[in-house]
C-alpha cells in the first residue's frame, strides 16, 4: 500500500524538506481558498464572487469601526493596547494556519481563522457605545443575515 504522503504531495511538506514557499507553489490559491473556507465552504463552487466580496467588506468595515471607536476614546491607553494586541493575535492566527499547512497539509485552512471572530467580538464588547450607532447595528445585522442565509441556502443543501 502506498503511504498517504506519496499519494498526496501536499502532506507533511516540512518533514519532506520542502520550504514554506513550496506550500504556495503547490497550492497557489491558498489565501483565496482559505478566505473562501473562512466565509463559506470550500466545496461550494456555485456561490458568486459577490458574496465573498460583500462579506469581506462588511467584516473589514465592522472591524474598522471597532478600531476607530477604540482609538477615539480619550485616555484609553489600555483599550488601544488591547486592540493592537488582539489584532496581532489575529495575524498570529493566520500565521499559525500557514504553518499548519506547511507541517500537516497545504490545503486551505479557513476554519483555523474562526477564533478571529471571537477576538473581534471581544474587542467590540469593549466599546459598547459602538452598538448605539444605527449604521453599525445595521451592518452587523446584514453580515449575520448573509452568513445565516449562506448556511441555510448553500451549506445545508450541499451536504444533503
Predicted regions and their residues:
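Juxtamembrane "helix-exit" motif on the non-cytosolic side of transmembrane helices
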Residues: 70-74, 94-104, 153-160
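Hydrophobic/aromatic-rich transmembrane helices and adjacent perimembrane loops
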Residues: 106-128
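Signature aromatic-anchored transmembrane alpha helix within multi-pass, membrane-resident enzymes
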Residues: 130-160
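Membrane-lumen/periplasm interface segments of multi-pass, membrane-embedded glycan/lipid transferases
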Residues: 1-68
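Lipid-exposed faces of alpha-helical membrane segments in multi-pass integral membrane proteins
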Residues: 57-61, 88-96, 116, 142-149, ...
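Membrane-interface junctions at the ends of membrane-embedded or membrane-associated helices
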Residues: 70-77, 122-142
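Transmembrane alpha-helix segments characteristic
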Residues: 76-99
Amino acid at each position: 500500500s502506498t503511504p498517504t504522503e506519496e499519494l498526496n504531495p501536499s502532506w507533511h511538506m516540512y518533514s519532506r524538506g520542502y520550504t514554506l514557499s513550496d506550500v504556495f507553489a503547490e497550492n497557489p490559491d491558498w489565501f483565496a481558498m482559505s478566505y473562501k473556507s473562512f466565509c463559506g465552504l470550500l466545496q461550494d463552487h456555485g456561490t458568486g464572487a459577490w458574496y465573498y466580496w460583500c462579506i469581506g467588506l462588511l467584516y473589514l468595515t465592522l472591524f474598522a469601526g471597532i478600531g476607530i471607536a477604540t482609538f477615539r476614546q480619550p485616555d484609553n491607553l489600555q483599550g488601544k493596547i488591547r486592540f493592537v494586541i488582539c489584532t496581532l493575535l489575529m495575524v498570529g492566527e493566520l500565521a499559525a494556519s500557514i504553518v499548519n499547512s506547511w507541517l500537516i497539509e497545504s490545503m486551505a485552512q479557513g476554519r483555523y481563522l474562526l477564533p478571529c471572530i471571537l477576538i473581534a467580538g471581544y474587542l467590540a464588547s469593549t466599546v459598547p457605545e459602538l452598538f448605539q450607532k444605527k449604521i453599525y447595528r445595521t451592518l452587523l445585522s446584514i453580515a449575520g443575515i448573509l452568513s445565516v442565509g449562506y448556511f441555510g441556502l448553500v451549506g445545508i443543501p450541499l451536504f444533503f
